[in-house]
Amino acid sequence: SVRLVKGSHIVTRRLFEHDHAYIFQNPDKRIIFAIPYEHDYTLIGTTDIEYRGDPAQVAITADETQYLCDSINRYFRQKISPADVRWTYSGVRPLLEEEGADNPSAVTRDYSLELDAPAGEAPLLSVFGG
């Protein structure tokens, strides 16, 4: 079966002058990145939260915003708060359900292919996971 996992991102003022990206590992073992974005901004992400709502209505939560700010503040001298967030975006991705994987971050990023090819009809290839 498929499990929906939400990833959210924040965009803040530019936090560093060069064009290199950073990748950090948090104490909870999650990876966070900070990437130069559109010359004047820094793109920070991502969260990894199980999602049970309508994928068309996905949005970042206050807790996710704070998590990303706290994550960056652990590593950068220039501190940020939710008030520094210029905009956000979120998305939902389907991951393969894994027995015993309660934490969305622990779910495999592997994929599965299913081919439905009834005789005399066009085949349908479905890709799950990622």
Describe the function of each predicted region.
Residues 1-44, 49-130:
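C-terminal catalytic lobe of FAD-dependent flavoproteins
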